[in-house]
Amino acid sequence: MKKLAIMAAASMVFAVSSAHAGFTPSGTTGTTKLTVTEECQVRVGDLTVAKTRGQLTDAAPIGPVTVQALGCNARQVALKADTDNFEQGKFFLISDNNRDKLYVNIRPMDNSAWTTDNGVFYKNDVGSWGGTIGIYVDGQQTNTPPGNYTLTLTGGYWAK
């Protein structure tokens, strides 16, 4: 009986003391965010340029695009065109109205060997790479309607 009384008293003390405890916010809230990425990081630069229609002759350069690939030791660096920028084996810039196309070729400017496969332009050798690819007019396109044209390339790696 004495033991039961002690247990009851201990329960009362615990209940009383825990009833008054609680969290009161009085500061700021911090957030922890984590993005998990592939080891092979391929960053593709931006290019903005203006050309007259008369400059859109076959093989005329549109401009250089920088590519920086890190951590790609056993991977082949690759660039993938959006579905709006590739059809029937050809890359193109698409107009803002999504009707007009300006066909282009993509070539590395360091003479390294690359291959195109279904909208993916990839380096034949594995390993990290930093350099520049050139975007060139494919065919005579001096009749291209004026407007804004876009080619979107996403960096990644090629896996066979």
From Swiss-Prot:
The keyword Kinase does not apply. InterPro entries: Adhesin_Dr, Adhesin_Dr_signal_peptide, Adhesion_dom_sf, Dr_adhesin_sf. Changing N73D: In strain: AL845 and AL847; chloramphenicol-sensitive. Residues 1-21 form the signal peptide. It is found in: Fimbrium. Residues 22-75 are annotated as: Receptor-binding. Hemagglutinins of uropathogenic E.coli mediate adherence to the upper urinary tract. These adhesins bind to the Dr blood group antigen and also agglutinate human erythrocytes in the presence of D-mannose (mannose-resistant hemagglutination (MRHA)). Belongs to the Dr-adhesin family. This is Afimbrial adhesin AFA-III. The lineage of its organism: Bacteria, Pseudomonadati, Pseudomonadota, Gammaproteobacteria, Enterobacterales. The gene is afaE3.
